[in-house]
Amino acid sequence: NSLYIIDDQGRLVERYDKMFLVGAHKGITNDLRHYSPGSHFCVFEIRGVRCGAQICHDFRYGELYREYKKRGVELMFHSFHNARMSAARLRRLNIWGIVVPASMQSYAANNYMWISTNNSSTPPCAWGSFIARPDGVVTGKLKNARPGVLVTTIDTRASYFDASEHWRDRAIRGVYHSGTLVRDDRSSRRKAF
């Protein structure tokens, strides 16, 4: 479960190893049967844009996106393989087709970063590859279970709506409120109206 970053000259630039492998805490199951987890945040540049990489199940841990944000990442490449399951299982249990796109849009908006979310086109698959811009809006999407190439202009200088821009850095530092706290008797009584 690794992603190799290769530059436009064909040189190996970096490697990302999936940090959160699928598997139970007790016992060796699923991914944990075959792989060991990574411990390295993969940050690299493409034409001056700081980029990061993640794999599949890593999306369940928003803390990884926050750490990449702290490292200045503006564009995340998040690779998935939510495909090749039976059509019956996909119909019965396609949480990925709902949860993954919603999570990626939320992570894009919460961290003000572009996210390229690719998935296998092997049918049946849970969802088609897409790009979310820093306000969470999906700017391009491939059809589900069809091979294709998605071309999107990514301009990190463009300005998008960012509801948390004023307080995000404080929250990252552990200050969990906006503005200035006020000491007030009524505010400190938690079990009174």
Sequence positions of predicted segments:
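Short alpha-helical interface elements
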Residues: 28-41, 69, 78, 84, ...
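Active-site catalytic loop in hydrolytic enzyme cores
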Residues: 1-79, 84-85, 93-102, 164-170
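C-terminal beta-strand edge segments of enzyme domains
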Residues: 110-114, 119-193
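CN hydrolase (nitrilase-like) catalytic-core segments centered on the catalytic cysteine
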Residues: 56-148
